[in-house]
């Protein structure tokens, strides 16, 4: 019994080992073509099992896919491995199958004006060497760019032309001419880009003005320019009568969320004291006086306005204005006689007065 049990165990172990080998070992009539760079396996064997599967070949398809995947994994395990950060990885070789591109082919770059002219006239570019012989220095130098041969901007002596101003700086003139050539080339490049993208560039005369700026816009621009320094305008000088701009960007200081228990206790006690106090928060006397003052100011403004309106209406009647009784004279509003309104004495030339014949108007003692 013991001998049979040992033999049965050995047979069972061999059977399990054979099943494991059968799971990872797949036999094909034709070897598969592998592209490990793309993790691709191409099976050239004819699917004979699918013909006998009937209308439901799902089981056969799953078995075929499982076998081909197993062969691909077996090939991956044969690659050299290395350890990277406590992990064993295998580096895939370069892919051999050319996959179709994801995006469409790029469009050809549009021709510039010179390229169009050269194609129309049949002009072909001539290839020139990058190095030329410089007779001045006696060595080979670049044809263009930095340290080029026959660099006229590096000469220490320039002959002044006969028709030029003898006091003109020829070195500065040559440098300015080079800057103009560079700017012209940049303008041509931008024009070519605009022509390629069908855009419109501003004219060479410059940009058109955007219009008259208001006082608020100028002030806002000046304020932005002042705070554009490294110190955010803190050490920027001000004009003698310049006003301090409002909203200069000061940060709000909030109370700490925790830690300052004394200040929090003080604020809470002050709030409770105000709520429990019997004294009203509104000063009735002060508010009443303020209201009466505003009403008096409004009435004074109305009287002043009415008096100015009356003066404008009576200005065309004559030098005396509005009068009652008596012939016109040089006085203002009066009743009877040649003088103004008087309680004693004969009528005179003055205005409202008491006693005497003094030729004056209203007089204070």
Swiss-Prot record:
Cross-link (Glycyl lysine isopeptide (Lys-Gly) (interchain with G-Cter in SUMO2)): 154, 226, 266
Region (Disordered): 233-253, 280-365
Listed GO CC annotations: condensed nuclear chromosome; endoplasmic reticulum; nucleolus; nucleoplasm; preribosome, large subunit precursor
Residue stretches of biased makeup (Basic residues): 302-325, 351-365
Gene Ontology biological-process annotations: endonucleolytic cleavage in ITS1 to separate SSU-rRNA from 5.8S rRNA and LSU-rRNA from tricistronic rRNA transcript (SSU-rRNA, 5.8S rRNA, LSU-rRNA); hematopoietic progenitor cell differentiation; mitotic metaphase chromosome alignment; protein localization to nucleolus; regulation of signal transduction by p53 class mediator; ribosomal large subunit assembly; ribosomal large subunit biogenesis
UniProt subcellular location: Nucleus, Nucleolus
Modified residues annotated as Citrulline in this record: 273
Domain of life: Eukaryota
Residues modified to Phosphoserine: 5
Gly residues composition bias: residue spans: 337-350
Biased composition (Basic and acidic residues): 235-245
Any GO molecular function: RNA binding
Pfam families: RRS1
InterPro entries to which the protein is assigned, alphabetical: Ribosom_reg (IPR007023)
Post-translational modification: Citrullinated by PADI4.
Similarity remark: Belongs to the RRS1 family.
UniProt protein name: Ribosome biogenesis regulatory protein homolog
Organism in which the protein naturally occurs: Homo sapiens (Human)
């Amino acid at each position: 019994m013991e001998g049979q049990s040992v033999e049965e165990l050995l047979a069972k172990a061999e059977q399990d080992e054979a099943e494991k080998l059968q799971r990872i070992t797949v036999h094909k009539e034709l070897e598969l073509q592998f592209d490990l760079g793309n993790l691709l396996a191409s099976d050239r064997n004819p699917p004979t099992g699918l013909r006998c599967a009937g209308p439901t070949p799902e089981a056969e398809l799953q078995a075929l896919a499982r076998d081909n995947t197993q062969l691909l994994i077996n090939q991956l395990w044969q690659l050299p491995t290395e350890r990277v950060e406590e992990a064993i990885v295998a580096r895939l070789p370069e892919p051999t199958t050319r996959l179709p591109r994801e995006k469409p082919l790029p469009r050809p770059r549009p021709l510039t004006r010179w390229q169009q002219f050269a194609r129309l006239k049949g002009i072909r570019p001539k290839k020139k060497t990058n190095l030329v012989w410089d007779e001045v220095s006696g060595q080979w130098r670049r044809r263009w760019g930095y340290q080029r041969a026959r660099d006229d901007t590096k000469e220490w002596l320039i002959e002044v032309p006969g028709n030029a101003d003898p006091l003109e700086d020829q070195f500065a003139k040559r440098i300015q001419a080079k800057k103009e050539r560079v700017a012209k080339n940049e303008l041509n490049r931008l024009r070519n880009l605009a022509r390629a993208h069908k855009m419109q560039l501003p004219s060479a005369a410059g940009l058109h003005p955007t219009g008259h700026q208001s006082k608020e816009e100028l002030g806002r621009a000046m304020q932005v320019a002042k705070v554009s320094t490294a110190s955010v305008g803190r050490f920027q000088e001000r004009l003698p009568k310049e006003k301090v701009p409002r909203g200069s960007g000061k940060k709000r200081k909030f109370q700490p969320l925790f830690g300052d228990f004394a200040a929090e206790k003080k604020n809470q006690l002050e709030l409770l004291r105000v709520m429990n106090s019997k004294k009203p928060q509104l000063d009735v006397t002060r508010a009443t006086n303020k209201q009466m003052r505003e009403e008096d100011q409004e009435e004074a403004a109305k009287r002043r306005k009415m008096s100015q309106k009356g003066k404008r209406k009576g200005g065309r009647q004559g030098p005396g204005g509005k009068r009652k009784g008596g012939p016109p004279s040089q006085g203002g509003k009066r009743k009877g006689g040649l003088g103004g309104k008087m309680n004693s004495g004969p009528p005179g030339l003055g205005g409202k007065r008491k006693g005497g014949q003094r030729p004056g108007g209203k007089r204070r003692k």
